[in-house]
Amino acid sequence: MSKLPLLPTTVIGSYPRPKWLRESIRLHKAGKISDEDLQEAFSDAVIAVLKDHYNAGVDVPTDGEVRRDEMVEFFAERIKGFKFYGPVRVWGTAYYRKPSVVSKIEYKKPMLVDEFTFAKSVSYTDNLKITITGPYTIAEWSYNEYYKNKKDLVFDLAKAINQEIKNLVEAGAKIIQIDEPALHTRREDVSWGVEAVNEAVKGVNAKLVMHICYGEYSFVAPYLNELKVDQINFAFKIYNYKPLELLKRYGFDKELGAGVIDVHNRRIETSEEVANDIRKILEYFTPEKVWINPDCGLKLLSRKIAYQKLVSMVEGTKVVREELKRKGYSVD
């Protein structure tokens, strides 16, 4: 990793696919373009996403996860033991290809290494983050038709994810984020769910981040310091920063990834609004341990709005950096 400024800015993972990529996917499904043409479109989209992140001033970018349709489906298609029967309705007219576990979970081959290697080759910084869905969330968002209980399923998934993470490190990944948005949704599972995440990162030599959002933080707060990760990033903006008091109460002592951008609202935050929110966060945590990020992935927004939100996030962060510099902090 290269040296980062105080209050590093990053993204959670996903970013809107360019319109032309969505059209290429449609044409491929219709049999009108080749597999090779589609892969070229995906690669071009990664370059476009990284260009957006660069232009916005993001310190730690991702490839936007543009090659992945969905955060669980992608991995279920590539890990042995899953089967798809068809889509299920999530809400309204939104459908999800919910996978079913029908046999023992086994790791087959690298799933993200090629994706990461290409992004690394075109990235403007070696501080490139790669994301992977965690074992608990994959299990929670799947049907279990094989294992006697969910815990056994989750721990077998943790072993598979651990192998993938180690392959990413071997390929040169330095910052790896485990996405666990479901981990804090069932109080009765949290203690062993945390153990499963630790199993997934066991023996890994990289900067490890975990992302959680939109659940009940009070379920997981007592266990956060037990996680064998360097940083945990949270959705804060949508909760008006109320979880900060909870984290302080439980003595949270890891790096804090602070969500300051609402990803479910098309309103573009101003840079001063972001700066004010960061000032709130610094009332609870020292700047040396704080990173700045959106609440969650940006893929559901238009590309234009997602980009403008990132610009506001970065500009607001710069305002606070300058204030800290005047107080004697080293910010570069």
UniProtKB/Swiss-Prot annotation:
One GO-annotated biological process of the protein: methionine biosynthetic process
Cofactor(s), by name: Zn(2+)
Involved pathway(s): Amino-acid biosynthesis; L-methionine biosynthesis via de novo pathway
GO-annotated molecular function: 5-methyltetrahydropteroyltriglutamate-homocysteine S-methyltransferase activity; zinc ion binding
EC number: 2.1.1.-
Keywords on record: Amino-acid biosynthesis, Metal-binding, Methionine biosynthesis, Methyltransferase, Transferase, Zinc
Enzyme class: transferase
InterPro entries assigned: Met_Synth_C/arc, MetE_arc, UROD/MetE-like_sf
Pfam families documented for this protein: Meth_synt_2
UniProt keyword Amino-acid biosynthesis present: yes
Cofactor descriptive note: Binds 1 zinc ion per subunit.
Recorded superkingdom: Archaea
Positions bound to Zn(2+): 211, 213, 296
Keyword set includes Transferase: yes
HAMAP family: MetE
Protein task: Catalyzes the transfer of a methyl group to L-homocysteine resulting in methionine formation. The physiological methyl donor is unknown.
Family: Belongs to the archaeal MetE family.
UniProt-recorded name of the protein: Methionine synthase
Gene (UniProt): metE
